[in-house]
Each structure stands twice: as structure tokens, then as C-alpha cells.
Amino acid sequence: MDNPQALPLFLLLASLVGILTLRASSGLQQTNFSSAFSSDSKSSSQGLGVEVPSIKPPSWKVPDQFLDSKASAGISDSSWFPEALSSNMSGSFWSNVSAEGQDLSPVSPFSETPGSEVFPDISDPQVPAKDPKPSFTVKTPASNISTQVSHTKLSVEAPDSKFSPDDMDLKLSAQSPESKFSAETHSAASFPQQVGGPLAVLVGTTIRLPLVPIPNPGPPTSLVVWRRGSKVLAAGGLGPGAPLISLDPAHRDHLRFDQARGVLELASAQLDDAGVYTAEVIRAGVSQQTHEFTVGVYEPLPQLSVQPKAPETEEGAAELRLRCLGWGPGRGELSWSRDGRALEAAESEGAETPRMRSEGDQLLIVRPVRSDHARYTCRVRSPFGHREAAADVSVFYGPDPPTITVSSDRDAAPARFVTAGSNVTLRCAAASRPPADITWSLADPAEAAVPAGSRLLLPAVGPGHAGTYACLAANPRTGRRRRSLLNLTVADLPPGAPQCSVEGGPGDRSLRFRCSWPGGAPAASLQFQGLPEGIRAGPVSSVLLAAVPAHPRLSGVPITCLARHLVATRTCTVTPEAPREVLLHPLVAETRLGEAEVALEASGCPPPSRASWAREGRPLAPGGGSRLRLSQDGRKLHIGNFSLDWDLGNYSVLCSGALGAGGDQITLIGPSISSWRLQRARDAAVLTWDVERGALISSFEIQAWPDGPALGRTSTYRDWVSLLILGPQERSAVVPLPPRNPGTWTFRILPILGGQPGTPSQSRVYRAGPTLSHGAIAGIVLGSLLGLALLAVLLLLCICCLCRFRGKTPEKKKHPSTLVPVVTPSEKKMHSVTPVEISWPLDLKVPLEDHSSTRAYQAQTPVQLSL
């Protein structure tokens, strides 16, 4: 009987034996799955030295072969009882959980090795591939054992049970080798079998697939069947003496089945050995467990290179292909990136025909563009590391149409124009790879030396530099040429600023407004704003005139002239006003020769009014070489070399025009002081003074005499000492004195006009008194307060006595020499009057001005009161 025919017969016999064994032992043992087992001892792990609480269910034994793992918490399989079957439980099975800190043996499917970037030497040919799914934990309430379980596929089947993976509420927590383990077991769930994640092995190495935990070989006997896909590789009983039922003839040479532990090994792995391996554990037909292993077989990482090594193409070409040499099937996963960014997902996602796509070991770039100029990298990655190779792709293009830009050291917007005299720079740029060669064609054909390059400098441009400039760009790689033109405009701003004025027309019946800004290239455009409707206000070049009928409503209305030029836009404003509050102000200035120049300025006389000047009622005729002259607008009269003997007197001005008239007059007098005061300060003297409106003064001299002049003695100018010289606008001065011995000082103020002294002020004497100390000041304050207190007490006593005297009625006879009563009450209250007796003769030093008054005047003679 061959192996395929013997396998079903063996399965049937194993099921019958398991059922009979189960029924025979159902009355001998009972297990309460809802009770919790407490651990009363600790067992030391053989490999790690970890203390694990031992769990002692009745008559459980752990075979010696299960203790080979480095850290184990073993729980023997229990027999199945009818009580358990009647409660919808197919039975419980216990598994060995092996852990070694956080790392297991290299061949264990549970081990998880972090993937490194490059593995030039592979020391372990079999490593678990990274599992992107997170691990889960299983917790059983009774056994108080915990460990970390990686992701695995596990199915448990029992013909007579209602067990499902949803019934398990399991949690296993991985701890360090020195930590303690605890586990709890639910009464309604059995401990699950577990396997590791996907395995990765190199070609020629051994694939080892273990069963973890190792099934209990005790009765009933377990049957293990290994498959790859639907093909049976090996089948046999689990245990040292169990028969081997089947072994795949095609893999007999390199296939080994360890029946003691259920481990399947395939030596000299090839690429076609990759796939999903399944292990089925059948125990007498009562339960069935399925373990799945995903195995990947890889060749060693190859040496890579990209061909061509320096790829070049032009923008708009049909295609460009890059090949990753050294890669082949089974050598890992191939991917492409551009400047470190993955290409496949970004380029092909959502595109019907992606412009970049991978075809085998090649990268195809359809219709390359300039942005494809980058560094391309092919990368091969496997669980054993990765390798990569790169190449720089050059995409030539251009030139694009050149762009000419203008910059000037004076102009903010030179693209429209540049001002004459400025330094102008022309720059030409054209997008091109490789960079394009730039040449210029100037507007001036007489210019022979034209420099090559992207920048053209035009220093101090003038009208001759205006015109058209051409920039030519040529790509030496593609052979293409492009040309662009620029029209350069050179503008010359008119000098100065626009000037506005208004004057009266003939007979003061109209107002004539004028705006001018001559010169410049091109000429400025002038236009009035604010004129009444119907008046022509421009625009006109250079000079603009406008006549408006005179009307009082024009007074105070600003008229603006807007002057536009290529370089700048400027304005000037004139406001016609009627004369109002005309006032003359004298101004004094001193020349270098010491002469005084007096100017009379008329305020409140705006244009279009005209000023007419007169002295003592006679019109003045300035000019003609005389000392009198007028300002340009006629509102200021200048009198040169002013003389106190000839030029003093009355001056007047009359402002008249189309909008009204007004005037003012002033009397010019020599320098003098109208009044002044001398105040005392600490270690200083303070002087303040005033002058009259028409007084002409160019400076003030503060003069002093240290000891003061004798009474009746006349003093000259030389006897006084000048302490300070102040300007004509000053009206006060502070003169510091010696702090220790200030003494007696005599001060006066001398006004001066040019070099001509005026009338000095009256002299005042400054006497410095003794300065009180802080103690004296405090004594004065305290004495004042005490005096006020005594005065208040005396006043209170007087009030009390007065109230007492008023309460008594005197019955004494009237004295014949009684004076007028102090208080004159009405006739009905004569009993309250107190007479005053004075000894004669009475010498009154206070005159009695009004005898009818009710006031009583106090005399210096003794006064006797009748009580």
C-alpha cells in the first residue's frame, strides 16, 4: 500500500482509538474549567533563570522533551471528560510557550529581525520577514502566564465542539528575562497554537519549520500532516516511535520530517520552494489545528549598475530607457526613485498611460521634459538588505525666448523709461540647458565694440542711447536660436518744480492763473484742477494760462496745477484770498559790518492783492539805488543801514486787489525797554522785561554794577559790566551770583540796534539777605503752628465769655460819659448792650469815617468794659 492510500486509513484508525480512549477515561477524571489555579511554587527556567510560577493541576505531567526551550511555562494536556463535553467544550489543551527575552533562536519563526539597509555578509540564511501587522496578546485567567505572540494564522477544529476564535479572550504580554510570567485561562477557551510570521531564506540554505508549541505526544496520539499548497510533503504520527506514513518522493533527497517534535526541514532551498506551508495536527479526530508558514526564498543581493551610465536626451524626444543591471527574479524587490522620491506610486497612480513606468529591469520615460533632469536610483530590497545604483539623467532644452530686463541706479520703474544721466544695465536671460550664448545688437549703429554676455552696461545715458536693443540667445547643444527686442526710452526731467501764481486782471475785474514748468524731454503736460466750470484748464505743454472772472466766492479756493512728466508727476497750488487782518511785523538783522537792516513784513495780504507802502502818509518809491527795496511779491519792505536819526517814524501798507482791500500801520521807535522786573532766586537773579511793538532791537545786554552806584551819582556806559548778550526775541534772563558772598548788585538792561545802543532800563538793586537754615525754618513753622493754637484757644474763650455776658441783664446806672455803643441793637433789645468807658482825653489814631456805621473802631487808649 503506497503512502497516499495509507494516509486515510491511518486517520480513520486514529480517530476510532481516540474516541474509545476518551470514553474509557471519562469517568476517572473531572476538571472544573471555571476554577482558578493558584501557583504555590516557582520553577526556574533552564536557559534564562527566570522564575515562573508553576501550575499544578491534578495528575499533570510535563515530558522531558518539552523542557528544551530556554524559558517555558508548561502545562500538560488533560483528558477529556463527559462533563466538559456536555458544556459545549471540546476540551482544553496546554502548550509550551517559549520565550527568550525579546529574541528567539534564529531558526524560530517567532524571531523578528529588524531589516537593515545594507547586508554585505549574511550570517543567518533564514530570517523572519517583517510582518507589518501588529502582534496580539493572549491572556488566560487561570494559569497566570503571559508572553508576547507575534501575528500568526491559527485555526482549531473539533468535530464535536462549538469552539471558535471569537470565544478566545487571550492576552500574552512579553517581559524581560528577569521578569515574572503570569497567565489566566478562561474556562470556555483552549490555549491557541502559534507560529511565526513569514520566513525568508537564501537559496541553498535549509528551511526549518517548527511546531510551536510542540503538541503533547501523550494519548491520544497526534497526527501531523505537512503541505505546500495542496501537495502533501510529509505525514506521520507525533512521537519517538510513531510511524511515518508519507514523504514526498520529489523532495525525498532534501526533505526531513522530525516526528519527535513535528519539525519539517527542506535542505538546499531553491526559488520554487517559496510558498505557503501548512501543518495540520490531528488528535484522534477530536480536534484539528492548522499552522501556516509563509516562506520566501531569495538569491543573494546582486551588484547593481544603471545603464547607460550618463544618459542624455533632449526635451521632446520619443523616450528614454534606463536599465538596472544585476537584478533578476528572486533577487528582491526592484524599485526606482528620482532625487530620493519614489516614482511608481507618484507617476502611475490615476494616470491612464503613465509617462514614467517600470518594465522589468528597465525604467521607461516617455517624452522627456526639462523637469526630468534628475538623479535616478534603482534599488533592490530583500529581507537580507538592499543594494542600489544611480545615474544622472541630463535633459537638454531651449533656449526659450529671451527676456530683457532693465535696471537703473535712479529710476524705480526703468522698464518704461530711464532718466538722462543714469547708469543703465540691460540683462538678457533665456532658459536653456546647457546655458545659452548671449549676444547684443545696439540701437546706435556707430557703436562697434559690443560686448558678449548676459549683461550690457550703459553708463550716463543720454538722448543718443534711446532706441531698440536686440538680444540673441543660442544653445550650442541643440543648435536652436532665439531673439528678443527692447525699446529703451531716455527721459529728461524739466529743471526745478512747476510754478503757480495768480494776479489781478485789468481793472481788477478778473483773476489770471499761471502755471509753468519749462524744459525737459519730452515737455511736461500741465492742467489746472479746481477752476469753475467752463474755464479752459489744459492740458498744455510747458506753460498754462487761465483767466477767471473775479468773484468773492473764489476767495480761499485752492487751485492746483498738475504737471505730468515721464519721470515724475508734480503739483503746485495757489489759493486766491481777500486781504484780512493785515498786520506789519518789524524784523531786524545785523550785517557783517555791524549795520542794522530792518524789514517790514505785511501778513494777511495774500495774492492776488498788491501791497502799497507809505511813510508819514507819503508813498514810498523803493528801488533806484536807495536804501529801500521791496521783495519779489511786494509784501516785504527792506530798509538797509537803518539809522535811528532818519528812519524812525510811522509806516503803513495798503493791500488791495480784485477780492478786497485792507491795511495796517506801525510806528518805529528806537531800542528801549518798556518795563522790567528783578526777582530773587537761590544764588541767582532773575530778570524779565517787555518792549513795545515798534521798538527795533537786534540784541540785549544784561549789565551789572557789583556794589551798586551811590545815590545821586551819574554812571556812564563804561562803568557797567556786561554779563549776558541775548537775542532780540529773548524776554528773560537768569544771572548766577556767588553763593558764599553774593553782596549787593545793581542791574539794568541795555537794548542795542546794530552797533547803536538804545535807552537803558532803570537800574534796580539786588541785596542778598541771610539764608535761613533748615532748623530755623522748622522753628518758624512750629512757632506759627503754636501761635495759631493759642489764637484759637483765645478766640474760644472770648466766645464763651460773650455768651455768658449776654445771658445776664445789667441793672447799673448809666454813666454820663458813655460813648456810642459798640453794637447798636433795636430799641426792644437795649438790655443786651454793653457800654464802653474810655479815659479822657481820647486820642483816636483810627479816624471814624462813618458815624452811622455799626462797626466799632479800636483805639490805642485803655478800654474799660462794664461787667
From Swiss-Prot:
It holds the Pfam family Ig_2. Disulfide bonds join C324-C378, C428-C471. Changing G769S: Found in esophageal adenocarcinoma; uncertain significance; somatic mutation. Residues 302-394, 402-487 form the Ig-like C2-type domain. One of its GO terms (cellular component) is nucleoplasm. InterPro entries: CEA_cell_adhesion, Ig-like_dom, Ig-like_dom_sf, Ig-like_fold, Ig_I-set, Ig_sub, Ig_sub2. This is V-set and immunoglobulin domain-containing protein 10-like.
